[in-house]
Structures are given as C-alpha cells and as structure tokens.
C-alpha cells in the first residue's frame, strides 16, 4: 500500500492505535472523534498501549483540545487499564 493512500477504519467506538505510526496519530484521533460524534457514537475507547506513555500523552493532548470531548480518563483494568483511554463526546452542533 502506498503511504499516501487513505485507510478506511470502522467507526465503532474503539480505535486501536497499535498499527499506526506516531506521526499519524494526532490527525487520526481528531478525525475519528469527529466521525464518531457525527454517527452518534458518544463513548469511545482509544487503545494506545502501555509502552513508554508517549502515545498516551499525545492522545490526551489531542483530546484536551478537541471541542467535542466532554471528558476522558484511563480505562479500568478490565478495559485495558492505563493502555487505553475512555472518552465521552458531546453531539456535534447542527446547522
């Protein structure tokens, strides 16, 4: 696959970042949040992994600035613990 080709992701409330390069994450997370909210999916789980925490910090930085994000927190142990973030969205404004 060409690096410039778009990848289509299922918008189902869970975004697993393990297969993406770090430089893709900022735009990917913001776009995923927009599309999920547009489809009425207002609770998300973003899997960033445990690793060094760099990816988690990047994801949290994007979420902090996103206008549709109401709140976010690390997942409970049964949902991935500190390797995943749970996100609550507000519906997008219409009109």
Range-by-range predicted roles:
Residues 1-95:
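Long, charged, low-complexity intrinsically disordered regions
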């Amino acid at each position: 696959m060409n690096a410039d080709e778009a990848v289509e992701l299922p918008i189902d409330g869970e975004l697993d970042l393990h297969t993406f390069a770090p430089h893709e994450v900022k735009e990917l997370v913001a776009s995923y949040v927009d599309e999920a909210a547009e489809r009425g999916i207002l609770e998300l789980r973003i899997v960033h992994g445990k690793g060094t925490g760099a990816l988690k910090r990047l994801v949290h930085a994007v979420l902090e600035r996103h206008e549709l994000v109401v709140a976010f927190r690390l997942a409970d142990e049964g949902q991935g613990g500190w390797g995943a973030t749970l996100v609550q969205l507000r519906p997008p404004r219409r009109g």
